[in-house]
Every structure is written in structure tokens, then in C-alpha cells.
């Protein structure tokens, strides 16, 4: 494993902390007027999802985590596990509820996702930034009904609920931003 010093800390860096792989969310260098400089770091534990804040004195080191991000194709969900495959090697991985988390409402079969693996075990699933999903249920848009801000809830084929404009109807395919959960456009 490689060792990183506090001077090399940056957002997105994956390190080992207390035996668990973590990713750095924020890293702030603090140089007080009196005393030794230090780094204030926010880390997310990749196994539990818990966020912790730690301080490291200048010159301290951490071990990098042997974590890889791999593009995989989503195959299916068997009720307990979500199954993914590496398109080049056809190698399959099964991710549990903790790894999939909120991404499950955006997963559609055959979509390409990014899986974070630690010791060949999926820790996190990142859906594509934009997905195209079919609307299974939404209220009909009544002309002139814009007092509510010009939007209505729509249930998608994966079960996710998104606010859409009044002109969008049931059965249409829409593009959704998975990072914000917002409607982007209709798909022709």
C-alpha cells in the first residue's frame, strides 16, 4: 500500500482509517498564528457510510485504500442482491442493500454503473449521471392549473417519484439527473 502525507490530502482521495476504507470529502489546511499547522479532514467510511471529522498534524501519514472504481453493467435484482457484470470479462458481482443504497431507484437493466470495489466486494454503486426512464403513473395535466408552481409528481418504472412539468403524460420517456433527482427533458 502507498503512503500519503498530509500535504497530499485532497478531496476524493481514498485512504484507510481504523482498518476501514474511507474517502475524503473535505480537506482544509489550517495554519494557526501560534502552534503547529494541521489538516482538518472530513472522511466518509465506505463500508458504513458514516461521516467523521479528524485532524492530522502536518507531516502525519495515512495508508491509501486498495479501492477501485469499475464500470459495470446492471443485470438484475433477485430480491436481496443487485447483480452487475464487467462487460469486457463477463465477471459478475453481487451488491447488497448497503452498497446500492439510494442508487436502486435509478437502476434500470443494461445500464452502465460505477461500482467501488474493496477486496473484490462492492462497497458503493454510482448510477449514471442521467437515466432515461418511462413514466408509469402521473396525474393528467389540466390546462390552466399552474397555481402549484407548474409541476406534478410522476412515478417512474423503477419506483422513483420525480416532479415533472404539466405537459408530460403517462407512458412517455423522460431524462432524469440522478445526482439531484430532477427532471431534465423528454426523450424523443
UniProtKB/Swiss-Prot annotation:
Species the sequence originates in: Methylococcus capsulatus (strain ATCC 33009 / NCIMB 11132 / Bath)
Function: Involved in peptide bond synthesis. Alleviates ribosome stalling that occurs when 3 or more consecutive Pro residues or the sequence PPG is present in a protein, possibly by augmenting the peptidyl transferase activity of the ribosome. Modification of Lys-34 is required for alleviation.
Family: Belongs to the elongation factor P family.
Compartments, record wording: Cytoplasm
Highest rank taxon of the organism: Bacteria
Gene Ontology cellular-component terms listed: cytoplasm
Keyword Ligase: no
Alphabetical UniProt keywords: Cytoplasm, Elongation factor, Hydroxylation, Protein biosynthesis
Coiled coil stretches, renumbered: none
SUPFAM superfamilies, A to Z: Nucleic acid-binding proteins (SSF50249), Translation proteins SH3-like domain (SSF50104)
Main location: cytoplasm
GO molecular function: translation elongation factor activity
One Pfam short name: EFP_N
Pathway: Protein biosynthesis; polypeptide chain elongation
GO BP, one annotated term: peptide biosynthetic process
Modified residues (N6-(3,6-diaminohexanoyl)-5-hydroxylysine): 34
UniProt xrefs under HAMAP family: EF_P
Record's protein name: Elongation factor P
Post-translational modifications: May be beta-lysylated on the epsilon-amino group of Lys-34 by the combined action of EpmA and EpmB, and then hydroxylated on the C5 position of the same residue by EpmC (if this protein is present). Lysylation is critical for the stimulatory effect of EF-P on peptide-bond formation. The lysylation moiety may extend toward the peptidyltransferase center and stabilize the terminal 3-CCA end of the tRNA. Hydroxylation of the C5 position on Lys-34 may allow additional potential stabilizing hydrogen-bond interactions with the P-tRNA.
